[in-house]
């Protein structure tokens, strides 16, 4: 009987221990699952006690103060001598003193006994800390971060960002203005970043003029909707590989390469631009590019092409002949300053919706001919300086143009010193033109169809008509009389 009782007790103990083990495993599993789930979701209202999480970015920035020059994220044990006697400030989101900030002069130590987890919201963490020169992220986990917008924006003296290459960015969705206006940065190793969830790259490297190279060739951009201004003003970049970027979801790419004036080559030939609406300023100021393959770009949805190739002064050729421009409303300054182009085929472009043609071909002074005869211009209101400085054009056929809605034609042909003939048809109308000053200035070889020669006293719209001889002089020739 006693042996039986002992056996029962032994079995009960074993069962009890087994149940306790199961409970322990389930409890740990639940806690870890909760941690993993909240880490993946990026829950900003963290209530985790299992990790040491920083306060949100802007709050930390305000705690650091604007005079800080160096910031170190580290383990407490590694900096005990440096922080001895300094009263710390709690900067953990739980407010339990798990992460402490020690200010020593202008240097800040942000320390914990364990790993420091960045808050999911890192917005403006170091925003406009204009004295900041160095940040060391030795003990800094970004695995929960979803928002990095403006994190280093305006850190004009920042020269060193340590241990950033290994950041876990798999949950980040917003990198807008991440390094904007960090002109002192000369190198950044971001090649290993996981950008699969990033939706916004707007202005990420805006005005990082000190960068000479940047490896983003392996970035996954499949989720990105806005790549506008991404490399805006990166005038020091001599090479940039974005050839394999997937921009299928992008709708905005305005000024993405603005003033990347040191780039001599750029491969964007495989980009799918079908969803892009705004291409304004895309290559504005890429003055060292000698060639550019955009011939297969899908432009059917584009509404704005203003400043697109402005000041691409080294481009000798450009194939945009098959572009669909039927939705474009703005071509302001599109080819301004493309002074090395010797030919440009835009003959089949549908310009029916274009209202702004201001400076469109200005200073394309190596073009000897340009066929815009079939362009539809009924929506155009502004033709200011459209052919200004096209000094090698000898003839222009504008016979298909309807200019009844144009209000500004001032300087339209100014500086076209070799222009002899301008052919127009019945659609040419200047009744609504209110600004026409210097329309034909310096067009000394221009001659109307009935023999009217250039007269420096008549350079406004008064002679912008088909030549009717001495009784009705004009500088144009009826298309019916074209040889």
Where are these regions (language model features)?
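Gram-positive cell-envelope targeting signals
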Residues: 1-43
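Negatively charged
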Residues: 31-483
